[in-house]
């Protein structure tokens, strides 16, 4: 198992402004060129923790993920975070893990934050995800999932690294 240099990016997210948030992220990625091998972004990094799912959702083939896949290849690093996704007429707080080799992995947040009314605007996921990356098995979860430790229990040492993307 090789080591992985990880950078955790926390920014002042511009509320519901995908283009500006992507522009700001691009600046940060340029400054990290050659310094890191994985970048962890906040939950809903491109919009803020918005409940405007119908207005802001994109499919996995949308502009946000397409742009991030290009940057993962360009900057030779893995990128993970979450965004507002749509699939089969449902909306998800979807975590993504994109590799420089073009692999893409997705996890839909299981435990929605009821006090923030997230469950009124998003569907919950029902599958945990273990990502194989550079000899590591990575479990990727989202924010409020942290409050439910049974969901992240490492039975039979399934994963080596647990990442929670949070806001």
Give the positions of each predicted feature.
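Extreme N-terminal starter segment of soluble prokaryotic enzymes
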Residues: 2-8
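Short acidic, glycine-rich surface-loop motifs adjacent to enzyme active sites
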Residues: 3, 37-46, 158-167
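Generic enzyme active-site microenvironment
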Residues: 8, 41, 143
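Short polar catalytic/cofactor-binding loops
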Residues: 10-15
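Short, solvent-exposed loop/turn segments at secondary-structure boundaries
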Residues: 17-21, 118-119
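Cys-nucleophile CN-hydrolase/nitrilase-fold catalytic domain and related Cys-dependent amidase chemistry
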Residues: 18-19, 26-100, 105
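Active-site catalytic loop in hydrolytic enzyme cores
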Residues: 57, 86-157, 161, 165-166
């Amino acid at each position: 198992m090789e080591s992985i240099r990880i950078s955790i990016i926390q920014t002042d997210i511009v509320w519901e402004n995908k283009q500006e948030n992507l522009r700001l992220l691009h600046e940060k990625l340029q400054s990290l060129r050659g310094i890191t091998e994985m970048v962890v972004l906040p939950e809903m990094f491109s919009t803020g923790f918005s409940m405007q799912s119908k207005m802001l959702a994109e499919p996995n083939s949308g502009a946000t993920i397409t742009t991030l896949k290009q940057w993962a290849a360009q900057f030779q690093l893995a990128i993970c975070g979450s965004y507002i996704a749509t699939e089969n007429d449902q909306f998800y707080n979807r975590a993504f893990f994109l590799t420089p080799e073009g692999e893409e992995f997705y996890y839909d947040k299981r435990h929605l934050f009821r006090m923030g009314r997230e469950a009124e605007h998003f569907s919950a996921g029902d599958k945990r995800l273990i990502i194989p990356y550079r000899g590591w098995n990575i479990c990727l979860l989202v924010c409020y999932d942290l409050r439910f430790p049974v969901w992240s229990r490492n039975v039979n040492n399934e994963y080596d690294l647990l990442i929670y993307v949070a806001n």
